[in-house]
Amino acid sequence: MATAVHRNGSLTPVSLRVFVLVGFGGGALTQALLFAVFLVLYVVTVLGNLTMIVVITLDARLHSPMYFFLKNLSFVDLCYSSAIAPNALANFLSTSKVISFEACATQFFFFSLLATTETFLLAVMAYDRFMAICSPLRYPVTMCPTTCTRLVLGTFCVGCLNSIVQTSLTFQLPFCSSNRIDHFYCDVPPLLQLACASTALNELFLFGLCGFIIVSTTLAVLVSYGYITVTILRMHSGSGRHKVFSTCGSHLTAVSLFYGTLFVMYAQPGALTSMEQGKVVSIFYTLVIPMLNPLIYSLRNKDVKDALQRLGQRHSLVKAVRGCPAAGGNASV
């Protein structure tokens, strides 16, 4: 424990201002392999999500509420992984693996903000599908551009509020027992283990707030898809059912992956008993899921695949036009 020695010989705990991210341990070869894995995951994540953002922005046929939310999901995923991956990559190549108190708090703030935002954004996307399938006549009025913008801003506001509460409660604690965070980024469970004061309030808020967020948004998704399922069963057109399944199937896959990993990480106390297990799960929802989401929505969505094809053809046409000589430029006089 870090201490300060007074003139009378008494000792007082001193809160640490620097942390060491232990990560996964191992020798130089292990660190190099982890660096390669993280780098590939992060590069694919960045390219995939940037592609989705560009395609949806440039293709007028994708300017609808569903793709507006999908573009924002790609933006959140891009920022989400960028809050974790660059620092982790730098630590794999470093021997000190030091992160300052302020940098740790900043990383956790954005991580918590973006994770909460994505949780609510997925619920909003489920509501959008519910309105489109179950109330198609009211859909254009209900999900107008103003409403969609407000819903997205609302998810960010809720995420920011939750992040402020979690960050304030966590980083007001005195960290004096050790400065070694048994993780590859700053997260609440390993940080609470370093505190030399009672963490009961923090644990209550951690499991209470995270539990409420996960349960409430999961219920919203389940209710939305419950109504969607009933509507699908009443459809007489096979092509209509197939189209609904193709659009909703992608979202259900993304929801299942994201909510499932969050539930394992935060809603089950037993999952926190093993930090190594927590690290593996953390890789999944900080890097793997943001990497998979663009693939899930592009490979299983005909509109996105067609938009990608049109964008590719447009790019090829522009290159061909630029490569052609000016008319008459090579003609003999």
Swiss-Prot record:
Disulfide bonds join C104-C196. Residues 1-35, 94-106, 172-203, 273-278 are extracellular. Glycans are attached at N8. Gene3D superfamilies: Rhodopsin 7-helix transmembrane proteins (1.20.1070.10). CDD domains: 7tmA_OR9K2-like. The chain crosses the membrane at residues 36-56, 73-93, 107-127, 151-171, 204-224, 252-272, 279-299. This is Olfactory receptor 9S13. It comes from Mus musculus. The keyword Membrane applies. PROSITE patterns: G_PROTEIN_RECEP_F1_1, G_PROTEIN_RECEP_F1_2.
